């Protein structure tokens, strides 16, 4: 199973949704499913699903459909969920704590190794057995513990400094919840989650009916 060159980001962003729905099917003891049945559950067309999956190999069988468990495992492999990723959270406020307590975090392979904050009153407090540390220790911690992913949950004014420390420590990917577009080297991957932008999109949809 080899990924073809030139896979669009739109395809990549649909894979986690396939993975999530396939997990639900397995939990409901569904062994196989057609692209048509999958399209009815997910909301994409059957043709779109087939095209997306064909970017990575031949998974279905004519007249049979897809083996749910096999497809789930294959998509997990494509997404890189076959190994663990050492992860840190920066910002132990509401968002940071919610992410640290997210039940699927560990199951998906994201191993929380450290939580950092600038507030001295937070130092030493544990969240899921991980002690909150001084953010000034972040760069060295990333270097010494082979941290690959940093999750930024700090205010906009502090986010770029945190990002710089992560990059200097050798981070490979950043999940950014701060309302800022971070400046990073080209080889650092950043996935932004701008909550206010998502809310503004929702407000638009509430007030307009012109979206296809």
Curated annotation (Swiss-Prot):
<dbReference type="Pfam" id="PF06971">
    <property type="entry name" value="Put_DNA-bind_N"/>
</dbReference>
<keyword id="KW-0238">DNA-binding</keyword>
<keyword id="KW-0805">Transcription regulation</keyword>
<dbReference type="InterPro" id="IPR036390">
    <property type="entry name" value="WH_DNA-bd_sf"/>
</dbReference>
<dbReference type="GO" id="GO:0003677">
    <property type="term" value="F:DNA binding"/>
</dbReference>
<dbReference type="GO" id="GO:0045892">
    <property type="term" value="P:negative regulation of DNA-templated transcription"/>
</dbReference>
<feature type="binding site">
    <location>
        <begin position="91"/>
        <end position="96"/>
    </location>
    <ligand>
        <name>NAD(+)</name>
    </ligand>
</feature>
<dbReference type="InterPro" id="IPR036388">
    <property type="entry name" value="WH-like_DNA-bd_sf"/>
</dbReference>
<keyword id="KW-0963">Cytoplasm</keyword>
<comment type="function">
    <text>Modulates transcription in response to changes in cellular NADH/NAD(+) redox state.</text>
</comment>
<comment type="similarity">
    <text>Belongs to the transcriptional regulatory Rex family.</text>
</comment>
<dbReference type="GO" id="GO:0005737">
    <property type="term" value="C:cytoplasm"/>
</dbReference>
<dbReference type="InterPro" id="IPR022876">
    <property type="entry name" value="Tscrpt_rep_Rex"/>
</dbReference>
<protein>
    <recommendedName>
        <fullName>Redox-sensing transcriptional repressor Rex</fullName>
    </recommendedName>
</protein>
<keyword id="KW-0804">Transcription</keyword>
<dbReference type="InterPro" id="IPR003781">
    <property type="entry name" value="CoA-bd"/>
</dbReference>
<dbReference type="InterPro" id="IPR009718">
    <property type="entry name" value="Rex_DNA-bd_C_dom"/>
</dbReference>
<comment type="subunit">
    <text>Homodimer.</text>
</comment>
<keyword id="KW-0678">Repressor</keyword>
<keyword id="KW-0520">NAD</keyword>
<dbReference type="GO" id="GO:0003700">
    <property type="term" value="F:DNA-binding transcription factor activity"/>
</dbReference>
<dbReference type="GO" id="GO:0051775">
    <property type="term" value="P:response to redox state"/>
</dbReference>
<dbReference type="InterPro" id="IPR036291">
    <property type="entry name" value="NAD(P)-bd_dom_sf"/>
</dbReference>
<feature type="DNA-binding region" description="H-T-H motif">
    <location>
        <begin position="17"/>
        <end position="56"/>
    </location>
</feature>
<dbReference type="Pfam" id="PF02629">
    <property type="entry name" value="CoA_binding"/>
</dbReference>
